[in-house]
């Protein structure tokens, strides 16, 4: 798409032959009958200042908004919801805004991943319990995207996803800064004594300059791109910076389009096919996307009943190199990516590898949506013939340490560490690790492998982003900036380094990671997709017999429900009672 975003409103077609009738609308059950209950519903709408012509015979569109005062990735979504509603009204729909939980990555503790499924449940039940015919999903910050989509899948009404968009580029003393990625970088410089407290305080004011999501290829940017690539957003939507005037135009176009989608009954089930997921994974690899995407994509696919696992990511990773020269795998930022042509241009570079027949929310195919898209800055978006990195964005390793797999981002690691054998320094929990890495007398070299336990879905709990373990301060002062680190936790998509993550099964449930001890040796071979703990089966059995599971963190409340029902990383970390396609009856109206 162009930098102006005008293509978002053009070329969208709608087949009148398949149009629903007003009496077929889901909302008609609430509003269309002549009984006492429908009388009450209509009376309450009039209480809100509406007249019958505002809603009669029109699709009711639920605008699910994850705006919050403490989620600055979504600061603008209060205004953008009005843009969406403007579009809905223009197209002959009746918009109603429904606020939902806002998962602010910086502020929600211990981890937003603890609450992804809660938001998914909220989104599904908001849509089910209200007279909603179609949904516009406003999200962006990391877990909001998969959560909203998972909820919409399970509900099954037509839905379109509106991405919050990335921040403007950060800037400090004339250097462009990326939130997250450069924070980690300069934190190590501060720990090494190479920048002052004054420098650090000044950087704090320049690394995040506007509303919007992290402007590197973190989890937010990755998941917004995946939503577009799988067909749930308008073409080019995921690349638009949050502060750009093209963004409200995209929002109103999404509002217009969802009305037609309701008449067409164009649901996520008709869009999110196995081929569409393959397209999304190919885009993820070419973008150098976040490792977190594996968990979210698997969870979304399982909501649809699709047999999908981490192995498919690895198969595609071996085929698709990194084309987006965006941090942390490259040098540029998301604003640069937008002006270079954005996701449509990158997908057009990938078109020989994509299934161009996949349907999207436009009612057109992916092939039609990306036709003619150009790359304007070839150093930002590379061709397949000259990639940024031939190492895939994500590698899935297996072995006796991770029988069900673990993941790594080879494109963001020092190449010398992609094949490595070293002695282990093991930490039982995050607090122990945080203390030990700051010790100047820690017995550690750059060849050691740091192992963190109890950071998984149950052990964290919520699988916090602890996986980019800090380089020990002693080594940072020596100039070391990467080493092999292994955990059952996740890491921020803005992070980088030779971090092996999502070890499954996790240590808390008795996975092999629980039995690793300081002094053991681990061997990693990314090319061979192998990870091996050099400890005999007999010794591992002895350690297993002596092992005791840590006490549960939550004796009651949502945390207890989470701990009882959460799946492992390779399963998408969904609740066992949310997966699958078993239909739920429509609510009775009394």
Predicted regions, residues:
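Short, well-structured alpha-helical segments in soluble
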Residues: 118-130
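A short, small-residue-rich loop immediately preceding and capping a beta-strand
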Residues: 128-148, 159-164
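Glycine-rich phosphate- or other oxyanion-binding loops that anchor nucleotides, phosphorylated ligands
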Residues: 115
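N-terminal amphipathic/basic-hydrophobic helices that include classical n-h-c signal peptides
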Residues: 1-15
């Amino acid at each position: 798409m162009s930098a102006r975003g005008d293509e978002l409103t053009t070329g969208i077609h709608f087949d009148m032959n398949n149009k629903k009738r007003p009496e077929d609308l889901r909302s008609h059950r609430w509003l269309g009958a002549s009984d006492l209950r429908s009388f009450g519903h209509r009376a309450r709408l009039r209480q809100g200042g509406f007249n019958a012509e505002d809603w009669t015979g029109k699709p009711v569109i639920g605008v699910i908004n994850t705006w919050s005062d403490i989620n600055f990735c979504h600061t603008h979504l209060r205004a953008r919801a009005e843009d969406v509603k403007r579009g809905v009204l223009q197209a002959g729909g009746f918009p109603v805004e429904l606020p939902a939980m806002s998962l602010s990555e910086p502020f929600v503790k211990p981890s937003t991943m603890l609450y992804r499924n809660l938001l998914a449940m909220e989104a599904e039940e908001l849509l089910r319990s209200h007279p909603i015919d179609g949904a516009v999903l406003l999200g962006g910050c990391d877990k909001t995207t998969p959560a909203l989509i998972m909820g919409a899948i399970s509900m099954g009404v037509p839905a379109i996803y509106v991405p919050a968009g990335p921040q403007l580029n950060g800037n400090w003393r004339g250097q462009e800064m990326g939130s997250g990625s450069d924070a980690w970088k300069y934190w190590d410089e501060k720990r090494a004594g190479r920048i002052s407290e004054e420098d650090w305080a000044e950087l704090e004011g320049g690394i995040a300059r506007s509303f919007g999501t992290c402007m590197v290829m973190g989890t937010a940017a990755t998941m917004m791109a995946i939503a577009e690539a799988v067909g749930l957003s308008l073409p080019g939507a995921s690349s638009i910076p949050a502060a750009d005037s093209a963004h409200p135009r995209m929002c109103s176009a999404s509002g217009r389009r969802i009305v037609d989608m309701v008449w067409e009954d164009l649901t996520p089930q008709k869009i999110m096919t196995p081929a569409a997921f393959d397209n999304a994974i190919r885009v993820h690899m070419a973008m150098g996307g976040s490792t977190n995407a594996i968990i979210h994509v698997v969870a979304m696919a399982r909501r649809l009943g699709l047999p999908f696992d981490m192995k498919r990511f690895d198969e595609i990773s071996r085929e698709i190199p990194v084309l987006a020269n965006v941090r942390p795998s490259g040098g540029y930022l998301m604003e640069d990516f937008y002006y270079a042509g954005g996701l449509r241009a990158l997908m057009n570079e990938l078109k020989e590898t994509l299934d161009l027949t996949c349907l999207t929310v436009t009612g057109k195919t992916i092939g039609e949506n990306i036709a003619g898209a150009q790359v304007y800055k070839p150093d930002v978006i590379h061709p397949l013939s000259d990639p940024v990195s031939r190492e895939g964005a994500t590698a899935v390793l297996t072995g006796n340490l991770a029988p069900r797999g673990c993941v790594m981002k080879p494109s963001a690691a020092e190449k010398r560490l992609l094949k490595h054998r070293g002695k282990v320094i093991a930490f039982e929990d995050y607090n122990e690790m945080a203390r030990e890495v700051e010790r100047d007398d820690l017995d550690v070299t750059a060849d050691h492998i740091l192992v963190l336990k109890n950071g998984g879905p149950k052990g964290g709990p919520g699988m916090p982003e602890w996986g980019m373990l800090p380089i020990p301060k002693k080594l940072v002062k020596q100039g070391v900036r990467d080493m092999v680190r292994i955990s059952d936790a996740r890491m921020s998509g803005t992070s980088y380094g030779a971090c092996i993550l999502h070890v499954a099964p996790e240590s808390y449930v008795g996975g092999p990671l629980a039995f690793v001890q300081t002094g053991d040796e681990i061997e990693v071979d990314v090319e061979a997709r192998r990870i091996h703990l050099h400890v005999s089966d007999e010794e591992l059995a002895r350690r297993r017999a002596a092992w005791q599971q840590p006490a549960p963190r939550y004796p009651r409340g949502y945390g207890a429900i989470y701990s009882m029902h959460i799946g492992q990383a390779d399963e998408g970390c969904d609740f066992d009672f949310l997966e699958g396609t078993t239909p739920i009856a429509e609510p009775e109206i009394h």
